[in-house]
Amino acid sequence: MLPIDYESDDYKFNKTLHRDVKISPNQWNNKWDLQFEDGDFKIVSGHDSLRNAINIAIMTRYKELKNELYSPDFGCKIHELTKAKKSTIIQKKIAYYCENVLKEMRRIKTVNEIIVTDNKDNNAHKYGVFFNITSISDEVISGSVNL
């Protein structure tokens, strides 16, 4: 077994991968709130980190991030549709755009299901997106995002 250089920049960088600051949706608007615990950011890892990353990818506008560290095509095109009149075709396009974003994520093995619902009783959100995926570690992860 090769020795590990715990002080190397590569080790420190890779140690932080798949660890994220926990975010949760604000039910009253289309924003997300950072979560805190004991006066500091709440950090999630593993499958919670993947669920968090999926939410971030879906909620980020396509090509919104200008930082070269990120892929220039990061984000989801659903935001082009949120002002369109509600219809079944718009729901199918939202599902298509979300599926494309999830298929690009390295930690996702299979996109099992995307369901887009019409949030008729919610004035803050027009649509709900439910996702069900299988991670590269063969764990099934589900979650949802409101648009």
Which residues does each predicted region cover?
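Acidic-histidine catalytic/liganding microenvironments
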Residues: M105-V111
